């Protein structure tokens, strides 16, 4: 039995929505990591009052006041993009900045729709942080996103809460739906039809919520359970939102000994995942519609592919190049260092199965998810894997190595 840390995506949204509510909220089981601390601290600087700890936090919203200092987003793209949507709807001036990694990630995709709504932005060349926002009284828009992005969709929807008129977001494919799901449960008029989300401006009262375990964190252990000899792993109290279970769907397509069930609903579906050693994995071409639903987990498919029969192919995943690192390049370069044959595409990769991972040293380039991936690879390698600067896992999963050690011992 394994419990993974609370969900990072939902923690960000719970903090933001509780700060936007009209009355106090009580939040249970929030994830405390470097990314979510940035969201918490920014909301505090804007005037929100927090009491308690991350296991039980009371949130007392206040009207936002213009901050004197620039607001630090650290390494958190979610903080930057979601707070851009919120701040665009307040008639005040704010500046967002981040660490060197975040300052290389593109912000044009969120600036464009928010400027169409009436906010003004000024950013570095090529629309990188730091970024100044002059908020305004916004107008609702109908916007087609160029890529399926839950962060862009959420930024526009959060801005639409205080806009005049209806806000519509249309995506090329479905992305994570935490924001619209939570808003709807809070009584905000939200309609979802396929990849189209329609929101009417609204206010809402405070709420009580328990954050489920993070399926993206559980994914590392679920994959380990499938590829490690004599493994049996059960993950409990984990979020099973259908827009987050893409990896589980792909593992079933590959023939993994895997099952999951929903045991309760609390704004989000929560349940249990069970996995056992899966010696008969088969390579797959990951279906295009699943790619946006597992964007953070796609590199793990390469690890599954090493042990599968036949070819495993990921395409239409160019978004991976715009994460904390260029995850396609970092994956391919480091797998080759470990003796794994892998082919790189502009929008993905291909790996031929039934290989072995010899071992060696890798550099995740400060990317928390890549560091965790290579650590899992080390456990199924011949000689072990040395992961440079592995402390970067604290961005999303501070006790990853402690939990990994427990799993290996048991």
From Swiss-Prot:
Q: Which reaction does it catalyse?
A: 3-phosphoshikimate + phosphoenolpyruvate = 5-O-(1-carboxyvinyl)-3-phosphoshikimate + phosphate
The answer on whether this UniProt entry bears the keyword ATP-binding reads no
Location, primary (coarse class): cytoplasm
Q: Which InterPro entries match?
A: Enolpyruvate_Tfrase_dom, Enolpyruvate_Tfrase_sf, EPSP_synthase, EPSP_synthase_CS, RNA3'P_cycl/enolpyr_Trfase_a/b
Q: Which EC number(s) are documented for this chain?
A: 2.5.1.19
Q: Where in the cell is it found?
A: Cytoplasm
From the UniProt record, which GO molecular function terms apply?
Answer: 3-phosphoshikimate 1-carboxyvinyltransferase activity
What UniProt keywords are attached to this protein's entry?
Amino-acid biosynthesis, Aromatic amino acid biosynthesis, Cytoplasm, Transferase
Binding annotation for phosphoenolpyruvate: 8, 77, 105, 151, 327, 369
Q: What class of enzyme is it?
A: transferase
* Pathway involvement of the protein, from the record: Metabolic intermediate biosynthesis; chorismate biosynthesis; chorismate from D-erythrose 4-phosphate and phosphoenolpyruvate: step 6/7
Question: Could you give a single Gene Ontology term from the biological process aspect?
Answer: chorismate biosynthetic process
Q: GO CC annotation: what is one? A: cytoplasm
Locate the residues binding 3-phosphoshikimate: 8-9, 13, 149, 151, 296, 323
Give TM regions: none
Q: Where is the active site?
A: 296
Similarity comment text for this entry:
Belongs to the EPSP synthase family.
* Subunit (UniProt): Monomer.
> Which HAMAP family does the entry mention?
EPSP_synth
Q: What does this protein do?
A: Catalyzes the transfer of the enolpyruvyl moiety of phosphoenolpyruvate (PEP) to the 5-hydroxyl of shikimate-3-phosphate (S3P) to produce enolpyruvyl shikimate-3-phosphate and inorganic phosphate.
Q: What is this protein called?
A: 3-phosphoshikimate 1-carboxyvinyltransferase
Originating species? Thermotoga maritima (strain ATCC 43589 / DSM 3109 / JCM 10099 / NBRC 100826 / MSB8)
């Amino acid at each position: 039995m394994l419990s993974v840390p609370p969900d990072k995506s939902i923690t960000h949204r719970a903090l933001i929505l509780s700060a936007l509510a009209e009355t106090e909220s009580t939040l249970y089981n929030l994830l405390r990591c470097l990314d979510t601390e940035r969201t918490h601290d920014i909301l505090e600087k804007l005037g929100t009052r927090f009491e308690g700890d991350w296991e039980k936090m009371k949130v007392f919203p206040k009207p936002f006041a213009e901050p004197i200092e620039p607001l630090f987003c650290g390494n958190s793209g979610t903080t930057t993009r979601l707070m851009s949507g919120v701040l665009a709807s307040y008639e005040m001036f704010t500046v967002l900045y981040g660490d060197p990694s975040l300052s290389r990630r593109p912000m044009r995709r969120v600036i464009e729709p928010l400027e169409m709504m009436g906010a003004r932005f000024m950013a570095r060349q090529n629309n990188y942080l730091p970024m100044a926002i002059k908020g305004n009284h916004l107008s609702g828009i109908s916007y087609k996103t160029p890529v399926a992005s839950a962060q862009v969709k959420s930024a526009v929807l959060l801005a639409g809460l205080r806009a005049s008129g209806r806000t519509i977001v249309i995506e090329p494919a479905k992305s994570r739906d935490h924001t619209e799901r939570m808003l709807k449960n809070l009584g905000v008029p939200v309609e979802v039809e396929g990849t189209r989300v329609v929101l009417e401006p609204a206010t809402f009262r405070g709420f009580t919520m328990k954050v489920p375990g993070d399926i993206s964190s559980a994914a590392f252990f679920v994959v380990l359970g499938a590829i490690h000899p004599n493994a049996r792993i059960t993950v409990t109290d984990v979020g099973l939102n259908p827009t987050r279970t893409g990896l589980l769907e792909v593992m079933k397509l590959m023939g993994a000994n895997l099952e999951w069930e929903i045991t309760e609903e609390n704004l989000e579906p929560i349940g249990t995942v069970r996995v056992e050693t899966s010696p008969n994995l088969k390579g797959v071409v990951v279906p295009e519609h699943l790619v946006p639903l597992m964007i953070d987990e796609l590199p793990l498919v390469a690890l599954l592919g090493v042990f599968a029969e036949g070819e495993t192919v990921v395409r239409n995943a160019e978004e991976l190049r715009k994460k904390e690192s260029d995850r396609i390049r970092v994956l391919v370069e480091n797998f080759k260092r470990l003796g794994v044959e892998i082919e790189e595409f502009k929008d993905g990769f291909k790996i031929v199965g039934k290989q072995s991972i010899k071992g060696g040293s890798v550099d995740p380039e400060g990317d928390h998810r890549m560091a965790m991936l290579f650590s899992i690879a080390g456990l199924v390698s011949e000689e072990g894997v040395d992961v440079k600067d592995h402390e970067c896992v604290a961005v999303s999963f501070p006790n990853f190595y402690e939990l990994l050690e427990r799993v290996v011992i048991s």
